[in-house]
């Protein structure tokens, strides 16, 4: 630390020299990196260009910082064509010299999805070429194609082409690509959830988080929010096309061709269920074909839906339970449990709905939406629980507490959680009510299906 002022002086002294006079690539690397860290991209540029041109395989920082430096130049220089051309070639060079990350895993998907992103952002190529670049990155290396913004723009580019009437971009192709990208979002979300769940379990056990834990949690929360935002945007786009009026004839026309394709059947059934098209006879055909082809957690769940629709709740729950037995992955099981809870909530089976929501949380502690569902169950029971008006309204405190927990385990739900908490709290007894009834700090127990209690706030 004592030498820091001297180091800064040295760096700025170097910065005043022309890049051509500094022959040592490692020195240039250090100089441009220091400038780039403080976003002084103009000063970084000449030193960076020297390293890129003379020592392209020296360090991957040349490409990581180069992307930022060139992006700045493109946005801030009137004559930016040169920088656009350099950026275009930067990604090709990046993959040529650093095709794998430090763990030995391919970076093709990451690098070329970034290239497609830059092509889109700076409008340097036709949409078809931008999409082809995204598509090559995704199909050749889906593992490292993980940036949520790039995933969203990958699909949005195809959607724009579809709406503009591009040849060969059919509705079928659009839905198929949506499923591909949506499933990738799920995979990335599961990775983030595993990190958050590990840390949440440590916190719940009363253990102290290490600095590494805190950093991992912070990064996972930030990425989780971004993932959730772009996934919601993706769903918003497809919802414009995914009506029952569009889905049913589309899947009907393709059914015979795909009735032996397990993946296609699962996707079609899932989409029809999500859009509440399960009353159509086609849904029955899809489910029966899927179950006869390969009895699985998915097919058993969909049969449960059919039984539920027919009012056969006991049989429906039996198939839901079979679905859970057939599913070995805890995170997929959590999603099934949540969907079962949501179905039961719609049918007014509150106690059973909470049971499945809590089981979902046991499998995935970071599933904030399960807390949102339970909070809604409590709020819907305000008139059914409690021996007097004060106790009936007190149920809203329990609902508010539960809604608050959603944001604790899943920060991407912060806005929803806060709005619900405020809404429920606003319907709970006021300070005047508490004072008048003399209930401050009293514990109120609910003998209805809730079988829980809440402590009245202190004045």
Q: What is the predicted role of each segment?
A:
Residues 33, 68, 117, 156, ...:
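Residue-level recognition of tetratricopeptide repeat
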Residues 48, 84-91, 134, 287, ...:
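Hydrophobic/aromatic packing residues within the alpha-helices of TPR/SEL1-like helical repeat arrays
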Residues 51, 94, 137, 289-290, ...:
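Canonical positions in the second alpha-helix
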Residues 20-282, 293-294, 418-424, 434, ...:
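Preference for long, solvent-exposed alpha-helical segments and helix-linker "stalks"
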